[in-house]
């Protein structure tokens, strides 16, 4: 008996309308190996499609619901550590919502660098500062 052949969409996820900047930041962060981020398979500048390895099918918000109150402190600590690590490597990640994090195989993954910026010189964001200081909640600008 032959094993079932996986479909392309089972292995890869294609994100539409990805700017060159988002692609470059995603690639930069992946190459740093500092946080779990999907591996890029390809990027098409003309169609603005980013094809990456699928790391799961449900975001934290899909799994726990949209309300930050449904998320336990331990998971928020993991997210906070991830955001701090990015910040320490000059990436300001402001789109802190449950839709941009995936738990799979006991790993936490971060996705969607559309609103992330290279942080030179160091810029600040009021919500990110509050979050890094211990606030457990999602950025209301992205809800």
What are these model-predicted stretches?
Residues 96-103:
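Hydrophobic residue at the +6 position relative to the catalytic HRD Asp in the kinase catalytic loop
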Residues 1-28:
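ATP-binding glycine-rich loop module of kinase domains
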């Amino acid at each position: 008996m032959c094993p079932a052949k996986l479909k392309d969409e089972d292995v890869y996820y294609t994100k539409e309308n990805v700017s060159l900047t988002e692609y470059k930041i995603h690639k930069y962060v992946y190459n740093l190996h500092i946080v779990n981020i999907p591996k890029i398979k390809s990027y098409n500048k003309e169609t603005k499609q980013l094809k990456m390895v699928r790391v799961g099918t449900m975001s934290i918000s899909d799994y726990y619901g949209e309300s930050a109150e449904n998320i336990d402190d331990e998971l928020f600590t993991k997210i906070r550590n991830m955001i701090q690590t990015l910040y320490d490597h000059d990436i300001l990640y402001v789109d802190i919502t449950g839709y941009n994090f995936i738990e799979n195989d006991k790993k936490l993954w971060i996705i969607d660098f559309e609103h992330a910026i290279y942080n030179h010189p160091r810029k600040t964001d009021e919500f990110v500062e509050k979050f890094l200081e211990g606030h457990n909640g999602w950025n209301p600008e992205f809800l």
